[in-house]
Amino acid sequence: MMSLLTPAVLLTQRLHTLTLSVSTPLGLVMTTFESSTLKDARLKLVSQKEVSGRLRLTLGAGRLLYLIQIFLATGTVQFQTMVLPSTDSVDSLPGTYLRKF
């Protein structure tokens, strides 16, 4: 579990599920992402940026990047998965690993 700064974000990873809780002007937004690619993944927070009312989180594991975009005004969440080229790995990028529970 990892807590991030402004706006308040909480990420929790269990098995193949990632739960995201974000405090927005509309209140608390909670959403769950399930993917078989998350099952044995050791997720790393690669970046967190707030741009034009959107919070962008980039998480990674191995050759996969998980791009999460939260629209703070509406609480809408977008989740995308991207595969890195075979020569790249998230392990070589700076960031903080999430702990599994």
Curated annotation (Swiss-Prot):
Q: Which InterPro entries match?
A: Bunya_NSs (IPR000797)
A GO biological process held by the record? viral process
Signal peptide per UniProt: none
Q: Which domain of life, per UniProt?
A: Viruses
Q: Which Pfam families match?
A: Bunya_NS-S
Can you tell me which family this protein belongs to? Answer: Belongs to the orthobunyavirus NS-S protein family.
What is the recorded name of this protein?
Non-structural protein NS-S
Species? Maguari virus
